Swiss-Prot record:
Record-given protein name: UPF0280 protein MmarC5_0355
TM ranges: none
SUPFAM superfamilies assigned to the protein according to its UniProt record, in alphabetical order: ApbE-like (SSF143631)
Family listed: Belongs to the UPF0280 family.
Source organism: Methanococcus maripaludis (strain C5 / ATCC BAA-1333)
Amino acid sequence: MKFFQEQIAIKETNILLKVDNPKFFKMAKNAVINERLNLENYILRNPIFLTSYSPLEVPDNAPKIVKLMAEAGFNADVGPMAAVAGTFSQLIVENLIENDCKNAISENGGDICLKCEMDTTVGLYAGNSSLSGNLGFKLKKEKMKNGYGICTSSGTVGHSVSFGNADSVTVFSKSAIIADAAATSIGNFAVGNAVDAMNNCLEKAETISKIDGVFVCMGEHAGKIGKIPQLIKTDKKEVLGNVFEMV
């Protein structure tokens, strides 16, 4: 199957989108614009939503994107903006599915939502760790039939706020929104030496609901908890923005 790829960059949102028909790019861009407008307008009236590191209650009449982010924040005990990248990825894929798109992968700064009718490998990007580019997660098409989230937080790579120093904390969930907030929360516990930091992350992961599994990478050390996709060896030196391939 042929896939088409396009970068959608609007202000802070920078999404790499792969779809099976280029007609979906315009739909996706419009979805980003509309959801950003909803979020920005809410933040103008409620600026604490942008800066809070703690979960926030939001009113019932808040925009859908705001309520989803707030829910994910409470689930992982972090501020709602911890889920922003995964939220955009998921809302785009959901929008495309509603418009009969059969295969869509949205990656927003390491936070991925994908719906594919074929097995797909997602490569591990973990900064300077020797595991980066040498491991991948093989997702079965059955797992992705209704969309699936794979989100990564790092204390050593990227511009997102993390209070820990993990090379990567990758969370797997049916919801990319839930996974994004969870990855941030778990990554905040990556303190101490590599082994202690990894164990701290895995212990925190046990307390978070609605996630399938977690993979933590700390230098030459790695650990997992819960159910994660099959780990396979790869020879792709992954970089941010190029983290998936079809198999």
